[in-house]
Amino acid sequence: MNILLLAGGWSSEREVSLQSAELITSAMIEYGHTVTCLDPLYDFDKIVEVAEKQDVAFILLHGSPGEDGILQALLERVGCPYQGASPAGSLLALHKAAAKALFRREGLLTPKSVFLPLKPEVTWEPGLNYPIFVKSNIGGSSVNVHLVTNYEELFIAMEALFNAGEEVLLEEAIIGQEVTCGVIDDQALPPILIRSQGKFFDYYNKYAKNGAEEICPAPLEPHVLKHIQEYALRAHNTLNLQGCSRADFILRDDELLFLLEVNTIPGMSATSLVPREAAAMGLTFPELVEKLIQLAIRDHRK
């Protein structure tokens, strides 16, 4: 097949995307596909023309325009199948506050939070218990995440994000173990337990070779593993996602599971989580990529 691989872009995760593209290109060639790579940072105006001549597109862009539904909408308009979530599902998952509202509606536990699209007054109080995570409302890989323990730290962290033009999400920190679980189609993968070297699983820990200890399958009781997988599937379906997604959680000592967010374009680098979970199920990296391609074609035909 002729495949359009879209990688790079202009988000803070650009380099991760480009590194992953090399691995995915090799996997596609192994299955006999012909790959055309475009980087929207330089080739955005070529996407429509090239996509019309392809059998399928593979989106490997984090943030805009890959995870916010823009490329998905373009590809749908020209009739080119692509892997993963629809434009609506992509945008809902990327907008953390919107996703959390739907999770709560479906009875999925998620930490208490406050969404701030604009900078509040100096006298404003968050109404949350410290410590608090201060996050960019739109973004992934734990970029622009700060853990604060008091009011002064809170405003410094918020100021930095607002000055960068970001919307802010405040979230009560849950004390527990970090776990993550991928979903492919209607099947949850073996969860991973993450023991980070820092205070939390931030951008450095996620992509550095020795940044965190990631144990797969997670060494947890069978009923806990099943619960994590069920939650990941429910989150996937709540956002009406297709293809592959990855849900991130905090598991408290009392076994309460808190859903943090869902990623619609999980990392596909050498150290990424979903490829490791797929490997635990017996899927090689090329097999995983091929499965996502076949799902893209199937979903397009529905």
Swiss-Prot record:
Q: Which residues bind Mg(2+) 2?
A: 261, 263
Give cofactor(s), names only.
Mg(2+); Mn(2+)
Q: Which UniProt keywords apply?
A: ATP-binding, Cell shape, Cell wall biogenesis/degradation, Cytoplasm, Ligase, Magnesium, Manganese, Metal-binding, Nucleotide-binding, Peptidoglycan synthesis
Gene Ontology biological-process annotations: cell wall organization; peptidoglycan biosynthetic process; regulation of cell shape
- Principal place where this protein is found? cytoplasm
Q: What class of enzyme is it?
A: ligase
Residues bound to Mg(2+) 1 are 248, 261
Q: Which SUPFAM superfamilies match?
A: Glutathione synthetase ATP-binding domain-like, PreATP-grasp domain
What is any one of the record's Gene Ontology cellular component terms? cytoplasm
InterPro entries reported in the protein's UniProt record: ATP-grasp, ATP_grasp_subdomain_1, D-Ala_lig_Van_CS, D_ala_D_ala, Dala_Dala_lig_C, Dala_Dala_lig_N, PreATP-grasp_dom_sf
Note describing how the cofactor binds: Binds 2 magnesium or manganese ions per subunit.
Query: Binding of ATP: at which residues?
Result: 127-180
Q: Please name the GO terms that the record assigns under molecular function.
A: ATP binding; D-alanine-D-alanine ligase activity; metal ion binding
Q: In which pathway does it act?
A: Cell wall biogenesis; peptidoglycan biosynthesis
Protein family per UniProt? Belongs to the D-alanine--D-alanine ligase family.
Q: Which NCBIfam families match?
A: D_ala_D_alaTIGR (TIGR01205), PRK01372.1 (NF002378)
Q: What does this chain do?
A: Cell wall formation.
Q: What is this protein called?
A: D-alanine--D-alanine ligase
Q: Which organism does this sequence originate in? A: Lawsonia intracellularis (strain PHE/MN1-00)
- What's the gene? ddl
